[in-house]
Amino acid sequence: EAMARDALRAMGLESFALRDVHTLSGGERQRLAIATLLTQAPQLALLDEPLSHLDLNHQVAVLDLFSRRARDAGLAVVMVLHDINLALRHADRALLLFGDGHHVIGPVAEVMQAELLTQLYGHPLRELADGERRYLVPG
């Protein structure tokens, strides 16, 4: 029970412990699914779009949480993200899957390049920098 309460707290859902799941919004259900995963104390988390239905503040909080768990508890995290700027901010490595079957994998700094992502998405992207942070925006 303590593990469940800790997971709910980590996701900002501690006051939802007694709520019927059917009364939760899509974002609240997504956060509950992540809390459920956390109670299992996995060594590997495979996450397909864990940020779907989440407001930006919750998206960043979830990514920060998984980054901390990876760093502090040795959790291996593999996730599908479509927000390239959040991936740039949080990922160590990236895998780009192209429609023709080829792929590019490697460190984020090498893989998440405007030229490659332009090919992937079929839309021009350009890179902006703000200090040490990089951002990719539509060209």
Go through each PLM region and give its residues.
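H-loop/switch region of ABC-family ATPase nucleotide-binding domains
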Residues: L81-H82
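Conserved ABC ATPase signature
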Residues: D20-L24, E28
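Conserved ABC ATPase "signature" region
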Residues: E1-F16
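H-loop (His-switch) and adjacent beta-strand-loop-beta switch element
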Residues: A94-P107
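Catalytic Walker B motif of ABC-type/P-loop ATPase nucleotide-binding domains
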Residues: A45-E49
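Helical segment within the ABC ATPase nucleotide-binding domain
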Residues: Q59-A73
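ABC ATPase nucleotide-binding domains
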Residues: A114, T118-G139
